[in-house]
Amino acid sequence: RFNRYHGLRMDFIYDGEHVQPAKHPYYFAGLFYLQEPSAMTPANRLPIEPGDKVLDVCAAPGGKATELGAKLCGEGVLVANDISNSRAKGLLKNIEVFGIGNVLVLSEEPGKIEEYFTEYFDKI
């Protein structure tokens, strides 16, 4: 059973034992993303508007990034970074499955991002 989680805009809490959402075809199709409420909160609290330029510095495995990307509605850009190359690969997979096209996935030190994108982002 899924219950509406009233703290966030489009999120539900799964409290059942018989269904395994991570094995559902809709999950593999990118129609929903599984994560803890604590991971949902940052992206839901940041006032993202379509067209914004957004940086997610610690983006893997992709929960915040997929929510931020969805809030951009295909406009603007999201730079999703994780300093771990292996985690960034998993992040890229999740972004691709979710179908968000305006995302640049990086595996870079934050200082390097600051150097190349000085005063570029609207939201971090």
What are the residue ranges of the model-derived segments?
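S-adenosylmethionine
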Residues: 1-124
